[in-house]
């Protein structure tokens, strides 16, 4: 795998240095950072991936992870000494790609990170696909609504209503969904 720019946030400075050395031996560049102000640190350093190590995740850290991963999604691996079911669910919901309990060994970190990156990429692809499907469905609904308005107002068949939308879109160099949204907006305005 290509070298990465990795942020390590660890309360234990000696352990952070050990992790840094292990990752740099693989050709990665590493930035060490405190756990405090994690969201801002991630925003500034723009790492390819982040590794957090702490005794236990607290609510503040989970909230900062949620903000940081929402702003700029990236693979995040968290190593903790202990975690309960609720903490694990909250961490995953906050965007953590992998949560490892009592398993921090420097020689395993890159392999765990690689798996987390692969999982993150698969999850991101699924998320993008879902967003695209939702957007397409929303466009389809607007087009159907606009066709209904044209069918009612101009006594057109469904096929002719669609052709009218398509012609208007082509004439104006716009997407059919944009023209349909204009039709719906005007119809809503005229109802008032």
Per-range role (PLM):
Residues 16, 37-39, 48-69, 83-84:
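Conserved phosphotransfer microenvironments
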Residues 131-192:
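C-terminal output/effector regions of signal-responsive regulators
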Residues 27-35:
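Short hydrophobic/Thr-rich beta-strand motif most characteristic of the beta2 strand and flanking loop
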